[in-house]
Amino acid sequence: MDQLQSTIEEAFERRAEMTPRNVEAKLKESITQVLEMLDSGKLRVAEKTDGEWKTHQWIKKAVLLSFRIEDNSFIKGGFSNYFDKVPSKFADYSSRDFRNGGFRVVPPATVRKGAFIASNVVLMPSYVNIGAYVDEGTMVDTWATVGSCAQIGKNVHLSGGVGIGGVLEPVQANPTIIEDNCFIGARSEVVEGVIVGENSVISMGVYIGQSTRIYNRETGEISYGRIPPGSVVVSGSLPSADGKYSLYCAVIVKQVDAKTRAKTGINELLRGI
């Protein structure tokens, strides 16, 4: 693995000169190997170790390099045709491959090669980009999008029209992460490497990026970039210092432990706030 990483790191420094016509065979083989390992779940862009998320920047660099060395090519679909650098994950899947994968794919859901889909995942007509990791038991509902390299935990529900941001550029940015057992309400957007802690509920139409103020109603604290575990979050606003206007924020209206989260329905958590 160290040799693979060093090959990618060295090649990335001279990426500007690369084209599909001058790429070395060894480098192309290395990039393909990384994408295959991402596709199978043997590698992932970010992992949680000792309670902290670590991003493997070299894997993201391999994904970026793949765009430099691949030409657009014809992609045949069931009801249309396409022209892109990245093939469909399921282009060569047989019925047996789908059964072995243990997930459901409802047409016209699209998953790019290099994304991992775990068992018991349900993909409604949605989009999952290259480098993403979607863990067991997750529902990706209609018109939801999972951006490049985003990390989606176990038993997550991404409701209709949800957008989970991708972060291949800039390459030093961390991926957007939705931890286990989270519910993301319809048409919400979580982007720019924000982390949503496990067992959290994000209400409908909440937008969270790195510059979004996250206001804890119980403590009065304002934070950025991370939703604590067990949070129930809704859209809100905070007044300006002079009181002349208000600006958007996300409001943590309550926090619950995992036991309460398991026993309480989603709608009930969002009532009485």
Swiss-Prot record:
Compartments where located: Cytoplasm
One term under GO cellular component: cytoplasm
Pathway membership: Amino-acid biosynthesis; L-lysine biosynthesis via DAP pathway; LL-2,6-diaminopimelate from (S)-tetrahydrodipicolinate (succinylase route): step 1/3
Enzyme class label: transferase
Cross-referenced InterPro entries: DapD_Trfase_Hexpep_rpt_fam, Hexapep, Hexapep_transf_CS, THP_succinylTrfase_dom1, THP_succinylTrfase_N_sf, Trimer_LpxA-like_sf
Catalytic reaction(s) noted: (S)-2,3,4,5-tetrahydrodipicolinate + succinyl-CoA + H2O = (S)-2-succinylamino-6-oxoheptanedioate + CoA
Chief site of localization: cytoplasm
A Pfam family recorded for this sequence: Hexapep_2
UniProt entry tagged with the keyword Cytoplasm: yes
Top-level taxon of origin: Bacteria
EC number: 2.3.1.117
Subunit and partners: Homotrimer.
Family: Belongs to the transferase hexapeptide repeat family.
Listed name of the protein: 2,3,4,5-tetrahydropyridine-2,6-dicarboxylate N-succinyltransferase
